[in-house]
Amino acid sequence: MPIKIPDRLPATDILRSENIFVMSEARAATQGIRPLKVLLLNLMPKKIETETQFLRLLSNSPLQVDVELLRIDNRPTKNTPTEHLDTFYRQFEMVKDRNFDGLIVTGAPLGLVQFEDVLYWEEIQVIMNWAKEHVTSTMFVCWAAQAGLKLLYDLPKRTRKEKISGVYEHKIHDRHHPLLRGFDDLFKAPHSRYADFSPSYLAEHTDLDILATSEVAGVYLASTKDKRNVFVTGHPEYEVDTLHHEYIRDCEQGIEPNMPVNYYPDNNASNTPVASWRSHGHLLFSNWLNYCVYQQTPYDLDDFSEANFTKNDE
């Protein structure tokens, strides 16, 4: 089934060129199907690039998904045209009285910024608290995972001395968990962060199901037992050249970053990277939509209630 996105969104032509079924709003209105309502809170500076990456992953599902784009505030951004934001993005005041099947909160380039110093930290808290009463399942990605752990478990910000950047191997810890269905025992995923997600620390201070970890990068995937909050510390949405562009950007800014590991053939930045994480990225989002969202959400979103959710997969 397709994803339904706003007409004229730049991602439409990109996704269609990749043979991804994108449905127009007009056509979707004629189908007798209740699509899943998913809200994408895009915190990244390059919003068009990021929205396209996430829409690509949301498209690989037999479920029809109606995606709405959300911005954190109305501050102008130098990386995304104001016209694009005004045309395709909603502000929180426009959606706060509605319920949604799913919410995705993207990462943000705030790895070394303390939570209280984030310009929109108050808005983030409001939206995450709102989601408890209005969203069936929320996925927190990278920086958002750290923010979610702070707000849900009051975990302090933990950072590494050096940024983790590259493609890391992970192992799964519960092959029967719905989010891991179809996963290989070992799989790869990109990381680009300063945040530290120690498996032992999360196990000691939370009741999360720790589902996948890396010896180097730490926890990659974790979930609350009711599957209403899913934490992804890496970037399964990244395109093959995203880490490359970040590396070149940091070099040009004089940061002297370490080269992304397990990324460039022969560890040579002049060689074209090869993506080794796409299949598991698509599978993760498909499993989230199916098992955390579709199988738990009410048919009528007006019937949203805590009673709809179970603690364990049946």
UniProtKB/Swiss-Prot annotation:
The species this protein was found in: Photobacterium profundum (strain SS9)
Protein name per Swiss-Prot or TrEMBL: Homoserine O-succinyltransferase
Protein role: Transfers a succinyl group from succinyl-CoA to L-homoserine, forming succinyl-L-homoserine.
The protein's annotated pathway: Amino-acid biosynthesis; L-methionine biosynthesis via de novo pathway; O-succinyl-L-homoserine from L-homoserine: step 1/1
Catalytic residues, chain numbering: 142, 235, 237
Principal location listed in the UniProt entry: cytoplasm
Gene that this polypeptide is encoded by: metAS
Keyword annotations from UniProtKB, A to Z: Acyltransferase, Amino-acid biosynthesis, Cytoplasm, Methionine biosynthesis, Transferase
InterPro entries, per the entry: Class_I_gatase-like (IPR029062), HST_MetA (IPR005697), MetA_family (IPR033752)
